[in-house]
Amino acid sequence: MTEANDLPYLLRVARGEVVKRPPVWMMRQAGRYMKVYRDLRDKYPSFRERSENPDLAIEISLQPWQAFQPDGVIMFSDILTPLPGIGIPFDIIESKGPIIDPPIRTQAQVDQLHALDPESSLPFIKTILGTLRKEVGNQSTVLGFVGAPWTLAAYAIEGKSSKDYKVIKQMAFSEPAILHSFLDKIAEAIAVYVRYQIDCGAQVVQLFDSWAGQLSPQDYDTFALPYQQKVVKLVKEIHPDTPLILYISGSAGILERMGKSGVDIVSVDWTVDMADARQRLGKEMKVQGNMDPGVLFGSQDFIKERILDTVRKAGQGGHIFNLGHGVLVGTPEDNVRFFFETAKQVDQLL
């Protein structure tokens, strides 16, 4: 039996232990702001190759670990990665983002989708997560991640990134039965995928429902929340002790609803004051976040001030320090280094 204090720091906090400082990692900590990543991208221009070739995905996942020693190392992947495994092919064009052609628009297309068998369709995930666990040992927590049903449905139905989500909203409000049957199938597949990631070594898994912030609260309750809850329920039946995090961009209007999803930790974006978030979610709910990633373009004194402000507002215990969104392209690497160094000494600075 592993002693609690032998477990990695972030995992201990995610499970409810109170420690001297909040653990720290960054969404998108492996990526284009790092020169080593850009050099690798120039050599391997296909995003899918970088995220699905185990050697490359492992190397990229470990780049921020080697540079900054964050308390969390997240698998380098994409939220769309499991879709071909249920019958939805996609491609990622470097300047345009994901393309799904043909997009899902009819009940007949939904009916043709099949269950996810990750062992056969996503075998590289086992290699990536297993190797990351070996590489970081108990020095850091290995995180898996998935897209939540509404957001994956938005990509699959729109066929690409969208500014107004007109196509999926048209389906939601004129043919809701098609959308509900699609969301249900995605929820089952994502639950299988999360369980597989945990089986392969993920110690914490983050669900990204990036586009659920585009929904009104009543539509969130209809089209996003029930399917988040289904994923969480199916995962917790098999892995009750694995902490789950939910992140939504632009979530100020639905924050309390996120707390009803069943996850252990709500990742708060920077548009919500952290003290308000803690009050709105209740003291039992753990939180993650939520410094504005734009702060990392400021002076080091300013960055330090904002780190301390966020940690102070989050209060004692139940907080994983992070940005309120992914780190931005062009962020100075020295400022990222300073962010991690400062966050790791925060108990001495407050």
Curated annotation (Swiss-Prot):
Cellular location(s): Cytoplasm
Record EC number: 4.1.1.37
SUPFAM superfamilies for the chain: UROD/MetE-like
Pathway membership, UniProt: Porphyrin-containing compound metabolism; protoporphyrin-IX biosynthesis; coproporphyrinogen-III from 5-aminolevulinate: step 4/4
Sites where the protein binds substrate: 28-32, 47, 78, 155, 210, 325
Function: Catalyzes the decarboxylation of four acetate groups of uroporphyrinogen-III to yield coproporphyrinogen-III.
Family: Belongs to the uroporphyrinogen decarboxylase family.
Protein name stated in the entry: Uroporphyrinogen decarboxylase
Organism: Synechocystis sp. (strain ATCC 27184 / PCC 6803 / Kazusa)
